Amino acid sequence: MSLSIDVTSLPSISSSIYKNESSSTTSTLSGKSIGRSEQYISPDAEAFSKYMLSKSPEDIGPSDSASNDPLTSFSIRSNAVKTNADAGVSMDSSTQSRPSSNVGCDQVDFSFNKGISMNANLDSSISISTSSKKEKSKSDHKSRKHYPKIEAESDSDDYILDDSDSDDGKCKNCKYKRKYFALRMRMKQVAMQLIEDL
C-alpha cells in the first residue's frame, strides 16, 4: 500500500498596506474609492444646511449623514475612514513591525490563494497461496519400506537340517543349531503377531 500526497502550494495570506497619500485606489472588496484626494466638508451648520438643500431628496442617502448632528456627520468621510495602524487590528502576515501612529493606513487587502493538489494512489497486491496436506493413505504408509516377506515355514526341520547350513557337514545335527533356529522361529512368530495387531 502506497499513499502519496502532493501539495503544490500551501494556503497563503498576503496583505498590502498603503501608506501616506493614495490616489483613488479601488478596494477589491467594496469597489469604492478610498483615495484621500477628496475634500472634507466644512463642519459647520451653515455649510451643512447649504449642502443638504442643494441635493434632491432622492440623492440623499446614508453616506451623506452618519448622525443627526451636523458637526459630527460630515467630519466622517463618506467612502473611507482615516485611521492609523495602531488603532486597527493588524492582519499582516509578515514579521515586519507595525508602523507608527503617524502613518495612516488606507486599505488592507487579503488574497487567500489555496491550491492543494492531492494524488492518492492506492496500490495493493495481496497474494495468498495455500497448500493442503494430503491425507496419508494406508497404502502409502505401508509402501514406505518394503521388508522381505516372512515365511513361517522357513524354519522347518528340513530347512534346519539342510546341508547348506552346515559347515561342510560337520554340524549337521548340532544341538545349538537346532536351538538357534527354534528361537529364531519363535521370534518371527512374535514379530508376525505384533504386525497383525498393529
From Swiss-Prot:
It holds the Pfam family Rota_NS26. Residues 16-30 have a biased composition (Low complexity). Residues 153-166 have a biased composition (Acidic residues). O-glycosylated. Hyperphosphorylated on serine residues, when in dimeric form. Phosphorylation by host CK1 is required for the hyperphosphorylation of NSP5 dimer. Its main location: host cell. Keywords: Glycoprotein, Host cytoplasm, Magnesium, Metal-binding, Nucleotide-binding, Phosphoprotein, RNA-binding. GO terms for biological process: viral genome replication. It comes from the Viruses. Residues 91-104 have a biased composition (Polar residues). Mg(2+) binds at residue 92. Signal peptide: none annotated. One of its GO terms (cellular component) is host cell cytoplasm. Magnesium is required for ATPase activity. Residues 16-37, 53-72, 85-106, 123-166 are annotated as: Disordered. The modification Phosphoserine is found at residues 67, 154, 156, 164, 166. It is found in: Host cytoplasm. GO terms for molecular function: ATP hydrolysis activity; magnesium ion binding; nucleotide binding; RNA binding. Its cofactor is Mg(2+). HAMAP family: ROTA_NSP5 (MF_04092). Homodimer. Interacts with VP1. Interacts with VP2. Interacts with NSP2; this interaction leads to up-regulation of NSP5 hyperphosphorylation and formation of virus factories. Interacts with NSP6. Participates in the selective exclusion of host proteins from stress granules (SG) and P bodies (PB). Also participates in the sequestration of these remodeled organelles in viral factories. Belongs to the rotavirus NSP5 family. Plays an essential role in the viral genome replication. Participates, together with NSP2, in the formation of viral factories (viroplasms), which are large inclusions in the host cytoplasm where replication intermediates are assembled and viral RNA replication takes place. Orchestrates the recruitment of viroplasmic proteins such as capsid proteins to these factories. Participates in the selective exclusion of host proteins from stress granules (SG) and P bodies (PB). Also participates in the sequestration of these remodeled organelles in viral factories. This is Non-structural protein 5.
